[in-house]
From Swiss-Prot:
Family membership: Belongs to the delta endotoxin family.
Gene Ontology BP annotations: sporulation resulting in formation of a cellular spore; symbiont-mediated killing of host cell
Name of the protein: Pesticidal crystal protein Cry1Bb
Coiled-coil zones: none
One Pfam match: Cry1Ac_dom-VII
Role: Promotes colloidosmotic lysis by binding to the midgut epithelial cells of many lepidopteran larvae.
Additional notes on this entry: Toxic segment of the protein is located in the N-terminus.
SUPFAM superfamilies, sorted: delta-Endotoxin (insectocide), middle domain, delta-Endotoxin (insectocide), N-terminal domain, Galactose-binding domain-like
Amino acid sequence: MTSNRKNENEIINALSIPTVSNPSTQMNLSPDARIEDSLCVAEVNNIDPFVSASTVQTGINIAGRILGVLGVPFAGQLASFYSFLVGELWPSGRDPWEIFLEHVEQLIRQQVTENTRNTAIARLEGLGRGYRSYQQALETWLDNRNDARSRSIILERYVALELDITTAIPLFRIRNEEVPLLMVYAQAANLHLLLLRDASLFGSEWGMASSDVNQYYQEQIRYTEEYSNHCVQWYNTGLNNLRGTNAESWLRYNQFRRDLTLGVLDLVALFPSYDTRTYPINTSAQLTREIYTDPIGRTNAPSGFASTNWFNNNAPSFSAIEAAIFRPPHLLDFPEQLTIYSASSRWSSTQHMNYWVGHRLNFRPIGGTLNTSTQGLTNNTSINPVTLQFTSRDVYRTESNAGTNILFTTPVNGVPWARFNFINPQNIYERGATTYSQPYQGVGIQLFDSETELPPETTERPNYESYSHRLSHIGLIIGNTLRAPVYSWTHRSADRTNTIGPNRITQIPLVKALNLHSGVTVVGGPGFTGGDILRRTNTGTFGDIRLNINVPLSQRYRVRIRYASTTDLQFFTRINGTTVNIGNFSRTMNRGDNLEYRSFRTAGFSTPFNFLNAQSTFTLGAQSFSNQEVYIDRVEFVPAEVTFEAEYDLERAQKAVNALFTSTNPRRLKTDVTDYHIDQVSNMVACLSDEFCLDEKRELFEKVKYAKRLSDERNLLQDPNFTFISGQLSFASIDGQSNFPSINELSEHGWWGSANVTIQEGNDVFKENYVTLPGTFNECYPNYLYQKIGESELKAYTRYQLRGYIEDSQDLEIYLIRYNAKHETLDVPGTDSLWPLSVESPIGRCGEPNRCAPHFEWNPDLDCSCRDGERCAHHSHHFTLDIDVGCTDLHENLGVWVVFKIKTQEGYARLGNLEFIEEKPLIGEALSRVKRAEKKWRDKREKLQLETKRVYTEAKEAVDALFVDSQYDQLQADTNIGMIHAADKLVHRIREAYLSELPVIPGVNAEIFEELEGHIITAMSLYDARNVVKNGDFNNGLTCWNVKGHVDVQQSHHRSDLVIPEWEAEVSQAVRVCPGRGYILRVTAYKEGYGEGCVTIHEIENNTDELKFKNCEEEEVYPTDTGTCNDYTAHQGTAACNSRNAGYEDAYEVDTTASVNYKPTYEEETYTDVRRDNHCEYDRGYVNYPPVPAGYVTKELEYFPETDTVWIEIGETEGKFIVDSVELLLMEE
């Protein structure tokens, strides 16, 4: 800093300094007399500390250097910047991080815990080592970008450092210690965002995947908002906590406001400009906020004279000082002339002071009219006023003496001398100083040098070149015996010419306008804008900006606006009164919301323009709204030739949208454009930048919506967006009457599926709902989804196409069924395979998927490589399947069934965007082929009808014979379980009741099958109702039975059998009966080995009967008429046997002489009955009961109980006794 002083001395040339009579009080005003780290503080009543210049200077230096490397800097600039940054934050001397922390602690008088301090400092030390290592690797790589080893090292160190700082940031925002840690947090957050920017600058050169670069970019955007909100929130909290009532509290309040603006808010204002996609070239940003140096009043009074310090000298209250000093929000202006008025305080000839008691300041916005403000006493001309000229001059440094005089016992505080050092930024040779100087001989003096509080950005150059702030205004604290000027300052980056330079994006805050139009107000900035902002609530213009165009007038520009709005609106721009842009802009916030970081958006006009004059006036206005709130932060002038990623995205989206439609008719959708592809184009449009192309985005959205409507109209599937999946119908009503006529109607109204098929909301792959089909543990019970396309939707002799998108699948079977079954089995690798469609990316703030992540482009030529019936190893997630339709018949309503099925445990599928569309009319060979197939199908249908008629007649006769009459509500008295099973077997000979591909789908004979099957179910229900033995078929093991000894229930031939292996074992059950009624005890059993198996029925006293089974006996038969059964015994011969009472084996014999080789397809293969070959029986309701194996014997007896309880006991004498069923049936009255 000494060298700076020498340069300045050469300019000032021994300015006169007022003399004092007492050498002991004479103030050394030599240029080297600076206070480096703090102003002198009083020995008593001290305020600790007023300033730490090294803390402030670090913040100023970093912000100043960042302003020079915004956008995309040159490689050399960036390497130099990182070297500077590491040197500033991790120098060889005292740790700046500790100084940051201590400085805020002293300002707010709150210390962090020792653990917090030690943890933070240690972690920052580690970050310093990581940054130094990264910086060195970066410089090495920049020297030779083609060196593979350097590239590998820099990438490795980048990833490690970024992760390290990401995890370190939370250590700098410990709960209840956020304010003292705030300056540390802001600097660390700044480092992180700068580091994340490097991924966008260099990531692809380092070998990062585009998805990784994008992920780092998304993190940068997200953390920019997070860090900004944190800094603003806790800055405001800390500032409000310091709000007090007296002058001393205001002094501390103002120091916090100034120092944390420099060390925190200035950085936050620059964060958005790190976005290289929005700012892809060098960018100039400007800080227009104002800060205030300390009042020029004595603060270093010696012990015993504390009242001579200005804040103790009957100073005004906190609120009075704030009202006098803090300027209301205003347009940025520059001082042009200062007139200072003086008064005299005289005690004696040796103790007197002329001092600053008031002033008039003339100031002007850029290109605007002159304004004047006055403060203090300005009508006293007994002492000649001093006028100082500042027009076109930056006052970069002030030096002021705070004097004190004692009048009787009352101290008087005032300023007898002040020097204003200036330079003309347009002419660096015009520099010097202008001085206010009055006679003074008082009791003490204190020098205030503005560079102590606002030091230059660097000591490498003279301060007239490296100054960071310029004087913008002067306030005055007024008390009875107190006058203390307060200087306000703006940052040097806010130039006074609004110059648009070449090859850069120029940001100009709108508070740099020359005027405000009616209805516009300047409001305080929210903390992250770097200054105040403009607001209006109705249609009109905001203001005019006088621009200085420092580029050829042929250069074309686009304009962007950073704004917040509670409504959709139109912005318009004018150059010299001529409208050049009008565009629609969207709402960014809700009315009544606080202004937050996310409230602001940067959006622009796509139409470029050029300036016609080197000095031009730019006007911004808004229209098409009323009674809403619109805020403007800044406008940006972007060279038109700059290619943004957003511009490339727009061009790509426009091509994609146009490619949806045919070249001959822009309102007609291409046939090969899938519904999934339209959704992806919609995502592409949604990801376009609102800031860059809002109007074009809206226009493209309308086109994509129209394409989506066309896609929906041509799609013959109902509910393609999967709003609902119906469960499987029960095709027989409770009373056994078929309700099949509604099946076709219901099947043609949306999707039907198994219970495990679920609808999922859209993800990063699907924009709309999709379905998942899981695996199954039993191939007889697959998970499925199906829908029928009704005949009325189809055209004769036309080819149709089923297509969709599969995220991933294994063993997914797809069928199209009409005359034949077109079939594919698809295995599609998922997103974590060799064919990823998207990358893992952060979700949005509301949990929405990130559909803007990079993914492979849609390629309609990639398709399934397999043919019908083959297992398909899909390399594309798109699938297609064709089917040809011949003649249509609305009465027959054959339609087309669309089926998806998983029948393996390992299988699964996620699919969506399903379409069934008309592909083309059939001609030539295809037409001939479908006609031939249709004829074969009809021939087979006729044969099936003949067979069905015969089988149906036989089955219906057998079913009718089970019941008393056609009401089907009462069984014949002699109907037994074997007869019911025999009838059911005949019913199941009706073929084509269900489709073999998915036997839950009704076939051509479903109606008659369900009719008869309903009667079978009724018969079983009636039969079960009259059998009073519980669990007589042992299907529930030994439930309801009493057991003595060792017995077991074993599965044999798909039946449950009771096995009694020992003669001492016994099984019994007490059964409630109706005394006086007749019952039939019927037992089906098998005896192995010697001895007898016995089933006994008895009451408590006597009335016992039994059935005996031997190994060597033949199966018993029974008389037809149970009304004459009183005369027969269990051992009667077979003469009385009737065919209705035939055993299971005879009843289940099948006549196959009239079988027809019918298959519901027109394939050339020999037909086989799929149901007979399929071990999975998909029978609705009652499942086919397996016949009793050979060797079992059925016997029965009549029994008339005399009490209400009988006992049935089962045992044997030796060998093994196997019992299939025990029935006790109530006789009909």
